[in-house]
Amino acid sequence: MGQPAKVLQLFKTLHRTRQQVFKNDKRALEAARVKINEEFKKHKNETSPEKIKEMMKLGSDVELLLRTAVIQGIHTDHDTLQLVPRKDLLTENVPYCDAPTQKQ
């Protein structure tokens, strides 16, 4: 896959992730859309392969961070937030054991 195709794929992936992460939050959806479009337009004439690779890495990292670390909160009262985790953020509750396993 050529570099322009990879850039376009990252652009689309960021927008899909934005739609999932900020679902039902019009203000956050619009702000994220504007920021993504602004950053891509700002660098659309970049020709240096190293710089493009660096920016692609940054975009991929941002997408991963949005997907794995952002959770929505809804104001339900004056000082109360209700967290709305997405299904892909939930993990099974696994027992924690800090003792090393014994070799036999």
UniProtKB/Swiss-Prot annotation:
One of its GO terms (biological process) is mitochondrial respiratory chain complex III assembly. The gene is Lyrm7. Belongs to the complex I LYR family. Interacts with UQCRFS1. PANTHER family: COMPLEX III ASSEMBLY FACTOR LYRM7. It holds the Pfam family Complex1_LYR. Keywords: Chaperone, Mitochondrion, Phosphoprotein. Its main location: mitochondrion. Assembly factor required for Rieske Fe-S protein UQCRFS1 incorporation into the cytochrome b-c1 (CIII) complex. Functions as a chaperone, binding to this subunit within the mitochondrial matrix and stabilizing it prior to its translocation and insertion into the late CIII dimeric intermediate within the mitochondrial inner membrane. Transmembrane segments: none annotated. It is found in: Mitochondrion matrix. This is Complex III assembly factor LYRM7. One of its GO terms (cellular component) is mitochondrion. InterPro entries: Complex1_LYR_dom, Complex1_LYR_LYRM7, MZM1/LYRM7. The modification Phosphoserine is found at S60.
